[in-house]
């Protein structure tokens, strides 16, 4: 009996052990299955993030960035930085990416700072290149990643459509030996230089607003003779001007508008009426324009100290109310006029689009030597980030999302575009005019606000507030003055930019620079 009880007890213990072993084995198999499932899901999430425009990374990806900052006030709200602002927070929310800026320089000092890093082979993961020679050096030394597959998998359909709208040449400018090594900024047409005049000075002197350039010169001469903006011990400034006379597609204070009114295109290759390709600086039209500028200088209309001026110095003259005339692009109210308006709301700057019969449409040949590009350091494990960021900022947030209020507010606040990581703009070629047409339609009631893109809606709100109050904010004034007043001039005039033909670095017909 005792032996039977012992056997029975041993059987019970053995059964329990086997039961527990079975449970443990089952739990381990279940845990292994859960682990494999989670691993597979995680790998799938990473794969989706790395191969789609808007896929979110399962873990935060931090990338180092070389950033170009604006020369003036960034207008970022207090407490916000280039690493923590509405753009970076939105990108972290949608993509789970975060930039860490390892160097920041203004446009004037950026190329020099980058060249030092290139020589030292100490490059950030992602950075901007604004000098063609530097880009070619990076390519020759195999220092940047191939982005061909990144563009195919992570560029949204709309972003590809934007690039394709410029023809093959734009993307080809960043392509070397069949590989896309640099993402170019789109060459959005900013329109011609407008003449900005102090209309309050015109009224104060009892003058008539100009209808021609010669009318405008008469007005500026009157500013000079009446010492407008000058203190007792100062000389009046006149028409301020960049020392180089000729500007780029995105700079103010040049004399391009005067050259163009003579049918001249200096420092550019053009096709003349006889069908010949000639250098614009050497044409008869350019000589006539230079003769006009010499006459303006002799009459005291052109700033007598223009040859000694720097961009910042010219900007200070405008902001401090020392001058009442300069040529600038449509966004001039954002920079520098907004800073003057903040100090003196009586300063009534008005743009004028003044053309003459001498102006003619020509075929202009352009290079990409002054273009900006975004590149990725060779060996960085997430090169797709650049295309994802561009797709979110310039497609998803503007056309698809409904949670971009904080970012949209930056447009009305006139936050400098350099607050965006990557610091290039990607948009349709005629985006400037399209936005203004849509805003005006909404203001006039022929388009619903809901039909506007995010950027259009933001400017629409600011312009509507401007029209609805006697004391608009500085930002509302700048939005209306730039988008409606300035661009509106060009829309109403049915402005068409000169036809441009882009050429690559290897173009054998035309030299890249005049030796």
What role is predicted for each listed range?
Residues 294, 346-356, 362-440:
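Polar, glycine-rich mid-to-C-terminal structural blocks
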Residues 18-22:
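C-terminal motif of bacterial Sec signal peptides marking the signal peptidase cleavage site
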Residues 1-10:
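Bacterial N-terminal signal peptides that target proteins for export
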Residues 136-149, 336-361:
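Ligand-binding "clamshell"
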Residues 48, 396-514:
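Conserved small-residue motifs centered on glycine
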Residues 23-216, 260, 277-281, 401-403, ...:
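Conserved N-terminal structural module of periplasmic/extracytoplasmic solute-binding proteins
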Residues 274-303, 350-360, 444-455, 459:
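Glycine-centered hinge/linker elements that transmit conformational signals in sensory
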Residues 148-153, 175-253, 271-317, 322, ...:
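Helix-loop-helix "hinge/cap" segment bordering the ligand-binding cleft or interdomain interface
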